[in-house]
Amino acid sequence: TLGRACDVEDRAKVIMDEYLQSIKEMRSIAQSIAKKPSVYWEWWPNPIFTPGKINWLTEISAIAGGINLFQDVELASVQTNWDDIIKRNPDYIMMSWVGVAFERIQPANLLKRPHAQELNAIQMERLHVMEEWLYCRPSPRLIEGAVKLAKMLHPQEYKHIEPPSFL
């Protein structure tokens, strides 16, 4: 293991156990939630890319009590179009463009797309810009992103959940 190679095996085991316990606790809460909202993750605006079934954001969405809007597509990354998003009508829209700084993402541009105002997410004011470093990079910080997402989707159910202490 990496912990053994760096001569910090005991510390690495504590971190791993805490990480896995966080996932287990979040998964348990998610299983108790009856109504799971759909989440559209926009990774890139033109052409539109979003994560599919075999992407970590499907699991992150699930442990946060949501459903990845494109979990039915057997790909890691799905190129789609705006008409498909309109048909699927997500409950939440999370904009996290790969390689683009948080402050440079412009939700106003999404709102100008045809029929955007008809989407559940827009009508319920559930369009959010999310941190790329918490959602678009496979790392231990994904659990931090999962906690943030869970508190947005189900604030009451996840109110006592915090990211692992090592983050």
Model-found features: residue ranges?
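N-terminal ligand-binding lobe of clamshell/alpha-beta domains
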Residues: 1-167
